[in-house]
Amino acid sequence: MIEFKNVNKVFRKKRETIQALKNVSFKIDQHDIFGVIGYSGAGKSTLVRLVNQLETVSDGQVIVDGHEIDTYKEKDLRDIKKDIGMIFQHFNLLNSKSVYKNVAMPLILSKTNKKEIKEKVDEMLEFVGLADKKDQFPDELSGGQKQRVAIARALVTHPKILLCDEATSALDPATTSSILNLLSNVNRTFGVTIMMITHEMSVIQKICHRVAVMENGEVIEMGTVKDVFSHPQTNTAKNFVSTVINTEPSKELRASFNSRKDSNFTDYKLFLDSEQIQLPILNELINEHHLNVNVLFSSMSEIQDETVCYLWLRFEHDESFNDFKLTDYLSKRHIRYEEVI
C-alpha cells in the first residue's frame, strides 16, 4: 500500500544543508496500522509528508497504492490524493465554519452535489459520535471533539489511507485513549491503512500492528509491536519501551543484584507471551529439574490484547544446573531469553 525505497530528503537553507532522511526503506501493508516513532528531529514528520506530496523526495521512491507518486504531475496526483486523508496535532479546523461545514469542506472543494455531501457528512459525524454537534463551531468544542471533527473530515471522501501526524500529542491521556479507540475502529470498519507518527510509545503499544523506530533520519529498528516490545535491539527502542513497560529492574536494583552475584550464579532475562505464561516453567525448573532459582524481577503488561511477562531469574551453579541444559529447555518452548552478563 505504501512503500519507501532508498528515500533521501535534503533541505537546503542558504549555506546550510540538512539531510532529514537517509536511505529509508520499508513497506506498509494494506489495512495495517503502522507506527513510526522517534524523538524530535528524527525525520518522522518529513517522512509522512512525502506520502501526500507535502514534501518531495531528494532521491529514492515513494510508492502509494502502486503509484510512484514523485513521477506524477500535480494535476495527475489529484485522484491519488483523494485516497489519502490526514490529521494533525493541532486539528487545522476552520474556526469560522461550523462542524458540518468543516467536515464537508473536501466535498465542497471537489464540487460534490449537496445531497451526497449531506449523506456523507451525516454518516461521518454519526461515526465519530458528533452528530449532535454539527451546528456548533470549533471554539465551542473540547480538544478531543476537535480531533474527532478532523478525523471525520479526513474520512468523508472514504480514503484508502489515513496519515496521522502526532494526532494525540495535544490531548490528555483519557482523550488520547478515546481517539486511539476511534482510529482502531476506523481501521476495522473501513479497512483504512493508517500510518501513525508519534513520539509516544503508549500510542504504539495500544493501536499499532507494526512499528519503525527512527533516529537522525534513519530507520534503526523495525518489526511487529510484540517483537519490538519483547526484544528491542537499539538503545533508542529500549528507552521508548521502558517508558510504558518495566522490562527490567531499575539501575539501583541491578546494582544491588550485581553486588550479591559471583561466579557461582548466572542470570537470565526471559520474555513470555500470553500462551507461555500458562506454562508451569518455574515449577518444572525447581521441582522436576531440581534447580536452585530465584526470581529477582518480574513484570506483566498488556500489548494491545495480549498479556506479556518479563522475568529475571538467577540460577545457582550447583550439580543440577551443570547437568541441565537450560537454553535447550527454553528454546524447545520457544521462550525468548538473554543471559545477563
Curated annotation (Swiss-Prot):
The record's GO CC annotations read:
plasma membrane
Give a GO molecular function annotation for the protein: ATP hydrolysis activity
* SUPFAM superfamilies per UniProt: ACT-like, P-loop containing nucleoside triphosphate hydrolases
Which SMART domains does the UniProt record give?
A: AAA, NIL
Its membrane topology: Peripheral membrane protein
Name of this chain's protein = Methionine import ATP-binding protein MetN 1
**Does the UniProt entry include the keyword Transcription regulation?**
no
Organism of this sequence: Staphylococcus epidermidis (strain ATCC 35984 / DSM 28319 / BCRC 17069 / CCUG 31568 / BM 3577 / RP62A)
Highest taxon of the lineage: Bacteria
Keywords from UniProt, A to Z, are: Amino-acid transport, ATP-binding, Cell membrane, Membrane, Nucleotide-binding, Translocase, Transport
